[in-house]
Amino acid sequence: MCGNNMSTPLPAIVPAARKATAAVIFLHGLGDTGHGWAEAFAGIRSSHIKYICPHAPVRPVTLNMNMAMPSWFDIIGLSPDSQEDESGIKQAAENIKALIDQEVKNGIPSNRIILGGFSQGGALSLYTALTTQQKLAGVTALSCWLPLRASFPQGPIGGANRDISILQCHGDCDPLVPLMFGSLTVEKLKTLVNPANVTFKTYEGMMHSSCQQEMMDVKQFIDKLLPPID
């Protein structure tokens, strides 16, 4: 994604309709690509925001009998006590931090960037935001969990993002990443960052997917945190 994996294509991008003064970087779920999410953001875009939907590298995934598929890091199991791919998660987070740095070089300050993702991508967006020294505007974490949660402190994190705004969304009928994981994650997040800035929304009948109401909530969150500045 950042020169370390030549087989990963360039991100799907929804360019700003005028000069970009803010950006959303959104990470897809396991086995997917950024294209579908770029289409979704094209439907809720604001003219001063650039939407960047990178594609994960293709790699074998333990959970899926070692079949190769787009994956930000290896997934060994989907229960809260499953072993985790610590080195893969940390390397993936470094790649996302490099992507943020690239946008800063392009003239968008990091505090005008929202990081987000769905499922595995949402997990990576949370982990990256909580471990980076880049001050971000917020995180939109959809149908996901916090990876390596035991590696975080018992109390608030230090660093740039202890007051970050987080919108976490989950379907109440999710069979893959159960709602309970979302609830446990939001409770943990409230101990790590200012709990007043953490919002948890659930969607009745929604499975491991998205819905129109959720995208409207995501748009409202983005537009509130990244207003036009000109």
Curated annotation (Swiss-Prot):
Subcellular location, record wording: Cytoplasm; Cell membrane; Nucleus membrane; Endoplasmic reticulum
GO molecular function list: lysophospholipase activity; palmitoyl-(protein) hydrolase activity; phospholipase activity
UniProt modified residues of type N6-acetyllysine: K224
Active site: S119, D174, H208
GO CC terms of this entry: cytoplasm; endoplasmic reticulum; nuclear membrane; plasma membrane
SUPFAM superfamilies membership: alpha/beta-Hydrolases (SSF53474)
Highest taxon of source: Eukaryota
Chain coiled-coil ranges: none
InterPro entries: AB_hydrolase_fold (IPR029058), LYPA1-2/EST-like (IPR050565), PLipase/COase/thioEstase (IPR003140)
E.C. numbers: 3.1.2.-, 3.1.2.22
GO biological process, one term: protein depalmitoylation
Catalysis performed (reactions): S-hexadecanoyl-L-cysteinyl-[protein] + H2O = L-cysteinyl-[protein] + hexadecanoate + H(+); 1-hexadecanoyl-sn-glycero-3-phosphocholine + H2O = sn-glycerol 3-phosphocholine + hexadecanoate + H(+); a 1-(9Z-octadecenoyl)-2-acyl-sn-glycero-3-phosphocholine + H2O = a 2-acyl-sn-glycero-3-phosphocholine + (9Z)-octadecenoate + H(+)
Keywords: Acetylation, Cell membrane, Cytoplasm, Endoplasmic reticulum, Fatty acid metabolism, Hydrolase, Lipid metabolism, Membrane, Nucleus
Ribosomal protein keyword on record: no
Functional description taken from the UniProt entry: Acts as an acyl-protein thioesterase. Hydrolyzes fatty acids from S-acylated cysteine residues in proteins such as trimeric G alpha proteins or HRAS. Acts as a palmitoyl thioesterase that catalyzes depalmitoylation of proteins, such as ADRB2, KCNMA1 and SQSTM1. Acts as a negative regulator of autophagy by mediating palmitoylation of SQSTM1, decreasing affinity between SQSTM1 and ATG8 proteins and recruitment of ubiquitinated cargo proteins to autophagosomes. Acts as a lysophospholipase and hydrolyzes lysophosphatidylcholine (lyso-PC).
Protein family per UniProt: Belongs to the AB hydrolase superfamily. AB hydrolase 2 family.
Subunit structure of this chain's protein: Homodimer.
Official protein name in the record: Acyl-protein thioesterase 1
Lineage: Eukaryota, Metazoa, Chordata, Craniata, Vertebrata
